[in-house]
């Protein structure tokens, strides 16, 4: 049996006619940027997240970079970032001219450790990037309390957590604002690159919108030195269709995760933990194994697709060697990078496929 790491086939088969019909509608209108589909998606996604404002942007990186820029964060400033994350979280900080300050996760949640945040705050610190890694909400109460005490902004990196809940509230509604990626592989994915920023702060939303539209507040009137980062009509239209199905698709992922959690019984494997008062949406089902590379080879030989998220922590990436952080300085992030393995997780996995993965992992010795 061959089981891919990720597959969109069943998801897209279910909505193929809707996607095709919407494509024809947008094509017929001959309006492809900043039109009706974008306005409707922004309204619908803001309502879904439980916030007042949504600004469509070109990708998930811009959804993090633009609010930092809007806050005036730049050269000489520092922003707290977990070291075990996708590099976009750190690049968003770097693009402003500020310095990312890397912090350890906890092995239990994979998310940033609030105690580590406190240790890294200086008089240069301006914000915290709260990443909901793999679909597991970060400990937002603690993070927001720290931010309040030190007068810091909190931007949620919700790129992997569409639909996740923290104490009954959607991620994206908990900090000062949040960036989402709609990269095709996400729980809510476009058919190309796309992203959005959400917030309850009108002034912030307006500035992010202007910065992503060449710094313009209206046509040919430019109040900032901005960028070109806009969610186009076609992707917005596709995302509107997918948003209607997101909760159902997430429920299916959670069912698959529950089967994994109940069925994997190998003493060499550490399973993910669902933290209290959260709804984990399992963008990634991340296991850990001291013999990770051997396990990966074993599973791949059985036709099971895998991935690593992420094999090199941010502080050891060549892009950040200028920070001078040595191997061993952030040991928990390094341990996760050395032991984490992501196994198949996508909408529509069958009982047979899930069982095959479970049996293969349990057979690893």
Language-model region placement:
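PLP-dependent aminotransferase-like
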Residues: 69-158, 165, 364
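Phosphate-binding glycine-rich loop
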Residues: 31-78, 92-96, 102-104, 169
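Structural detector of well-ordered beta-strand residues that form the stable sheet scaffold
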Residues: 55, 80, 101, 154-155, ...
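Short beta-strand-to-turn element immediately C-terminal to the catalytic PLP-Schiff-base lysine
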Residues: 180-181, 195-200, 240
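Extreme N-terminal starter segment of soluble prokaryotic enzymes
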Residues: 1-5
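PLP-dependent aminotransferase class I/II
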Residues: 9, 21, 36-43, 48-54, ...
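Glycine-rich phosphate-binding segment of PLP-dependent enzymes
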Residues: 10-32
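Conserved active-site segment immediately N-terminal to the catalytic lysine
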Residues: 156-191, 218-223
């Amino acid at each position: 049996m061959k089981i891919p790491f990720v597959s969109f086939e069943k998801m897209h088969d279910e909505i193929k006619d809707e996607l095709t019909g919407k494509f024809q509608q947008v094509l017929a209108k001959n309006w492809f940027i900043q039109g009706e589909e974008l306005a409707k998606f922004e309204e619908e996604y803001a309502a879904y997240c439980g916030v007042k404002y949504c600004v469509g942007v070109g990708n998930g990186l811009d959804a993090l970079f633009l609010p930092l820029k809007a806050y005036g964060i730049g050269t000489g400033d520092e922003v707290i970032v977990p070291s075990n994350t996708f590099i976009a979280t750190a690049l968003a900080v770097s693009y402003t001219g500020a310095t990312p300050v890397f912090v350890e996760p906890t092995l239990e949640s994979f998310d940033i450790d609030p105690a580590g945040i406190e240790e890294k705050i200086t008089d240069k610190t301006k914000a915290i990037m709260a990443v909901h890694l793999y679909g597991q909400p970060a400990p937002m109460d603690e993070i927001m309390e720290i931010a309040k005490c030190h007068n810091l902004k909190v931007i949620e990196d919700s790129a992997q957590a569409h639909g996740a809940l923290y104490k009954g509230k959607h991620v994206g509604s908990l900090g000062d604002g949040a960036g989402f990626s709609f990269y095709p592989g996400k729980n809510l994915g476009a058919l190309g690159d796309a992203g959005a920023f959400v917030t309850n702060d009108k002034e912030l939303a307006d500035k992010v919108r202007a910065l992503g539209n060449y710094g313009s507040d209206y046509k040919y009137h430019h109040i900032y030195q901005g960028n070109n980062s806009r969610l186009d009509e076609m992707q917005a239209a596709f995302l509107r269709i997918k948003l209607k199905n997101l909760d159902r698709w997430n429920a299916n992922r959670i069912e698959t995760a529950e089967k994994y959690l109940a069925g994997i019984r190998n003493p060499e494997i550490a399973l993910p933990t669902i933290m209290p008062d959260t709804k984990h949406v399992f963008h990634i089902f991340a296991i850990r194994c001291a013999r990770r590379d051997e396990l990966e080879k074993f599973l791949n030989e059985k036709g099971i697709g895998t991935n690593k998220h992420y094999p090199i922590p941010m502080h050891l990436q060549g892009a950040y060697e200028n920070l001078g952080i040595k191997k061993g300085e952030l040991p928990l992030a390094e341990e996760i990078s050395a032991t984490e393995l992501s196994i198949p997780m996508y909408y529509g996995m069958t009982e047979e496929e899930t069982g095959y993965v479970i049996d293969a992992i349990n057979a690893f010795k």
